């Protein structure tokens, strides 16, 4: 596939309402002492595929902001993933086949959105592949 491919535009669509979501099938309960919040792929490059201030991205960003604030207040650690720009083709793996070159080091691509920026006690995991945890700096 071409190495010049980028992310396609994602058309607007409404988020499902609570009553449209399927019921939880697993009886899991949140254990605050074992919980963490993962804010995944909120860099300008990825979010730029959506139309700003329109659904789904506008309510998603507001929800992430609220979740992160509540997690911090509850003492739950907040982790972010951030992909490095200008990754070597061999490091991109399947991502290169599907999406081409990927993000660059530019300020238009690299930073996590200002409204969701990590706070001093948050953690940023460098993301190399689709999995946020492969070759991560998480110990």
Model-predicted segments: where are they?
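Active-site acidic carboxylates
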Residues: 2-119, 123
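Alpha-helical scaffold elements lining the catalytic groove of polysaccharide deacetylases
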Residues: 127-139
């Amino acid at each position: 596939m071409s190495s010049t491919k980028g992310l396609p535009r994602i058309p607007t669509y409404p988020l499902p309402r609570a009553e449209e979501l399927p019921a939880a099938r697993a009886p899991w309960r949140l254990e605050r002492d074992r919980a963490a919040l993962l804010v995944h792929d909120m860099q300008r490059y990825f979010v730029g595929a959506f139309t700003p201030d329109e659904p789904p991205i506008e309510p998603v960003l507001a929800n992430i902001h609220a979740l992160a604030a509540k997690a911090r207040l509850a003492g739950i650690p907040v982790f972010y993933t951030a992909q490095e720009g200008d990754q070597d083709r061999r490091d991109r793996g399947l991502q290169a086949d599907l999406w081409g070159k990927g993000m660059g080091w530019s300020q238009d691509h690299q930073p996590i959105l200002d409204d969701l920026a990590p706070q001093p006690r948050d953690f940023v995991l460098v993301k190399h592949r689709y999995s946020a945890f492969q070759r991560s700096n998480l110990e």
